[in-house]
Amino acid sequence: TTEESDTIKLGGNFELSGGASAYGTLMDEGIKMAVAEQNAADGLLGKEIEYVSYDNKSEPSESTSVATRLATEDNVVAILGPATTGAANAQSPAVTRAKVPAILPAATGDGVTMDGDSVLEYVFRVCFQDSFQGKALAEFAQTDLQATKAVILVDNSTDYAIGLADAFKETFTGDIVAEENFTAGDTDFKAILTNIANLDYDVIFLPGYYEEGGLIIKQAREMGIVQPILGPDGFANSTLVELAGADNVDNVFYASHFTPNSEDPKVQDFLAAFEAEYGKPADSFAALAYDAAQLVFDAIANADSTDPQAITDALAATEDFEGVTGTFSFDENHNPIKSAFVIELQDGVEVGNSIVEPAK
């Protein structure tokens, strides 16, 4: 058992290659930094923390294998990751069987901590969920952008985008003038953009990831479509601006878990340390993963134990955890009660952010 061991082993199940590797790599780096900092401050319970991570190749089936290997062969006391909702759902049966807690930094799909109506005892997340960001973006569209007519361009190949579109439609009180579909991996969006080019609307809602998002922004702006474009947290990657071209990224807004422009000294220290360690800026995914690691350290300290069940119970009891992505407690479904940021981009650069509070 881990009780006799002189290190505390934490596992990482991340997308280090494949389609979601831009997210997974930053998360893995955020955790490595948190572990190094904690070890420099004398570790936990008098022991050094050892972090073991494997690549799930952005494949759900591989995510299951990695989780099983970490829990049963490496005997980790907790697993951090994976990044995506699909990979997280694939991991859940394995961590439930092994009775080892998993902390999801960024899996935003609504049901990810649930099995039907009952909560998964060993699954927690530090990010807000899709129904919340879909609602928050609809609120932002009608309140901050004063939009009364919207067009939705939805990636109909991912549960992520479909869930976001549904939550937006439920909340938006104006008219949905048109809804067009695309598929992950598409590169030419002229047809769907031509369909909406001459319609009368105030905002485009674009639930999808940064690859297609960046190309759609580029092609829309090049066709003279000037309306604000609103996206989810999947836009939060610098590749979005690279693909779109900075001069095309005007009036683009997206939901984020994190803003680097926070005054909080904790956030500024984190950003400086990450930049020094990796020679690149931290993004919201690095920040969420860093918080996920800190949350586990917190739970181990509060449990005063390296027993996975004791850590699980301490995680469930988390209250007012102060992370770099905000302060939160867990609700009964292991979702954090926290705010979202809506980031505004002009010329590809963040020029402002608004806070959208969770509904009480």
Identify the meaning behind each predicted range.
Residues 1-9, 40, 357-360:
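Short, low-complexity disordered leader/linker segments with a strong preference
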Residues 2-4, 8-32, 54-61, 83-84, ...:
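Extracytoplasmic "Venus flytrap"
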Residues 16, 120-184, 203, 296:
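An alpha-beta-alpha
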Residues 22-29, 44-114, 126, 181-189, ...:
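Beta-alpha junction/loop-to-helix N-cap segments that form part of ligand/metal-binding clefts
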Residues 63, 125-150, 162-164, 188-190, ...:
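Hydrophobic alpha-helical segments within soluble ligand-binding/sensing domains
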Residues 95, 164-255:
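Extracellular/periplasmic bilobed ligand-binding domains
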Residues 217-290, 344, 350-358:
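Extracellular/periplasmic periplasmic-binding protein-like sensory domains
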Residues 276-286, 297-350:
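Segments of small-molecule ligand-sensing domains
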